[in-house]
């Protein structure tokens, strides 16, 4: 699993890059439709609990651990408005698998979309110019990367909801997700600031690791 950032400061775009070791998107951090059945009250309770823990962290190692938990919980929180990225990804993978014409690949669920894209190299000189329609209502583009080979961009309702251009899987948020994200962090930062402001003098003097790294955290968040 890997998580990194790119394009910090880009307005309206989610810059989280999250991939599993096998090249698949890491769905623990990438929102997709129907991930959770928690009630709103349960979400609020968990968000506030993480905020309280974050407000009292003692070092950056703890901060990194908590920030990952925040990103995971946020992915769940957005699931009721998120597009079905997981289904779109599987449809894209199946579409490209058919392009390989390699029967040995059939049923190889452990292979990622990029694995199948790699198998298309040399099979079609205009492959990057094609736009594949997906059953879920999205489209798949496969741009040629400067490093060689193909990348993948899955678009849905005008938004690039999932992409990999050589550095891992990232995504942009839909307008509904952006609104839900703001709602999530309104709860989070209100509780975080409340704990900081109402804490003991010792707590208020504690290094504020989240505020020190807040631009980075908010880009990741």
Please state what every model-predicted region is.
Residues 1-221:
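Type III/flagellar secretion export determinants
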């Amino acid at each position: 699993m890997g998580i990194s950032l790119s394009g910090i400061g880009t307005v309206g775009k989610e810059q989280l890059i999250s991939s599993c070791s096998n090249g698949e998107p890491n769905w623990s951090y990438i929102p997709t439709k129907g991930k959770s059945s928690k009630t709103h009250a349960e979400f609020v309770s968990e968000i506030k609990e993480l905020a309280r823990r974050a407000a009292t962290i003692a070092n950056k190692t703890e901060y990194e651990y908590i920030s990952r938990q925040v990103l995971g919980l946020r992915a769940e929180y957005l699931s009721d408005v998120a597009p079905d990225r997981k289904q779109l990804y599987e449809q894209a993978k199946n579409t490209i698998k058919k392009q390989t014409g390699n029967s040995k690949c059939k049923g190889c669920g452990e292979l990622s979309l990029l694995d199948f894209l790699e198998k298309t190299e040399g099979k079609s000189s205009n492959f990057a110019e094609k736009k594949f329609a997906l059953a879920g209502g999205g489209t798949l583009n496969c741009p040629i990367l400067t490093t060689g080979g193909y990348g993948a961009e899955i678009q849905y309702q005008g938004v690039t909801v999932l992409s990999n251009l050589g550095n891992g899987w990232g995504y942009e948020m839909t307008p509904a997700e952006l609104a839900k994200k703001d709602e999530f962090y309104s709860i989070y930062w209100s509780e975080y600031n409340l704990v900081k402001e109402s804490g003991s003098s010792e707590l208020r003097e504690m290094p504020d690791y989240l505020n020190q790294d807040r631009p980075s955290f908010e880009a990741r968040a």
